[in-house]
């Protein structure tokens, strides 16, 4: 890709501020846009939210929406809906520039009517059948890094530096 592609992360009705803060930090570190769709289970100035995101908030490109209708009216997709119910794996998809990875609330996921209307774009992360779901912020991180891997990690550092030693 010649220009840096855009990846969008969408949280629909998040309930737990620490999860949203962790997702915000992931978005800041990977240059993803974050879209928060209400109603949310916390105030945006919640201390737990800010603490989980550390001091990365100024790196964040974030938008807020009153609900799904507001979000869809302002964004054109393509959308990929992460759900525990889908038959297609997240690694079986080739993600285009401008993709929106959409995640539901921690306690309920995405509305089933939305999933049923968009079956071809519903994807899942494989896991044991004895567990309900992965943590929201972990799921977002896995999804983000799969897309960035496919895009060859555009404009992200691929090496680090030791503080007191040199790599050989």
Task: Give the predicted meaning of each segment.
Residues 1-168:
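Post-transcriptional modification and biogenesis factors for structured RNAs
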């Amino acid at each position: 890709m010649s220009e840096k592609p855009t990846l969008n992360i969408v949280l629909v009705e998040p309930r737990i501020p620490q999860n949203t803060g962790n997702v915000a930090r992931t978005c800041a570190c990977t240059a993803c846009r974050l879209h928060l769709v209400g109603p949310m289970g916390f105030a945006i100035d919640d201390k737990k939210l800010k603490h989980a995101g550390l001091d990365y908030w100024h790196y964040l490109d974030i938008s807020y929406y009153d609900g799904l209708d507001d979000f869809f009216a302002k964004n054109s997709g393509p959308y990929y809906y992460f759900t525990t119910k889908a038959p297609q794996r997240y690694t079986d998809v080739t993600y285009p520039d401008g993709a929106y990875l959409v995640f539901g609330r921690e306690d309920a996921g995405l509305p089933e009517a939305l999933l049923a209307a968009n079956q071809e774009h519903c994807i899942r992360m494989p896991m044991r059948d004895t567990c309900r779901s992965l943590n929201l912020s972990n799921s977002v991180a896995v999804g983000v890094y799969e897309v960035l891997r496919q895009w060859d990690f555009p404009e992200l550092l691929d090496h680090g530096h030791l503080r007191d030693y040199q790599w050989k």
